[in-house]
Amino acid sequence: TIESCTCDYKFRGDSGNDWEWGGCSDNADFGHRFGKKFVDSGEKGRDLRHAMNLHNNEAGRKTVSSEMRRECKCHGMSGSCTIETCWMRLPTFRTVGELIKERFDGASRVTMRNDGSPSDRETESSFVPYNPSHKQPASRDLVYFENSPDFCERNDKFGTPGTRGRECNATSLGVDGCDLMCCSRGSTTTEIKVKERCSCTFHWCCKVKCEECTSFRTVHRCL
């Protein structure tokens, strides 16, 4: 833990409802300030790439803060809820990751305003949509200014090997599935012989002896 990061004491006392603040609320404000100072310190430029990085950094921090939830605990005899104390808890890493992934999938392509470099790097007003018919990105939207390289084909300039010859999963609908990984080029199917250790037994002391078994496995590879 960071010694200077204490509980968030603004959540204290009577809430005015049928519960009261108590416990130790996660200090999201401290985390926001610390993260901003630590992550943004490397962004010194004034060009579009640096403005994009600063915007996306802030979008991530705002996503974390906006997903804080109230947790409560009951106090009382025999399991009754005579008194209920509550505190604010940060979302889990999985929750944040899923939200960021959703925003990544819906990221907005932007360009710099016509008047040049932004006067305020911390706001989304630095950008305009690349497509004029699209709406202005919000503060928690992720943005980008150029398309990713084509990862389907080999590109020595970017160091991407492409997906030709990659083993894929014929039954998966995810990124490891043949439909996506092979970029609609199709795949081959072959039966290969595999030698594996099997029927392993432990012998005192201290060895494990195994037999060698042969099996056949179906392998799918991208065209």
Curated annotation (Swiss-Prot):
Q: Name one GO cellular component term.
A: extracellular space
State the protein's name.
Answer: Protein Wnt-1
Q: Which UniProt keywords apply?
A: Developmental protein, Disulfide bond, Extracellular matrix, Glycoprotein, Lipoprotein, Secreted, Wnt signaling pathway
Q: Where is this region: Disordered?
A: 110-135
Instruction: Specify whether Disulfide bond is a keyword of the entry.
Output: yes
Post-translational modification, as annotated? Palmitoleoylation is required for efficient binding to frizzled receptors. Palmitoleoylation is necessary for proper trafficking to cell surface. Depalmitoleoylated by NOTUM, leading to inhibit Wnt signaling pathway.
Instruction: Point out the glycosylated residues in this chain.
Output: 169
Q: Cite the InterPro entries for this sequence.
A: Wnt, Wnt_C, Wnt_CS
Q: Which gene encodes it?
A: WNT-1
Signal peptide stretch: none
Q: Name one GO biological process term.
A: canonical Wnt signaling pathway
Q: Which domain of life is it from?
A: Eukaryota
Q: Which GO terms of the molecular function aspect are on file?
A: cytokine activity; frizzled binding
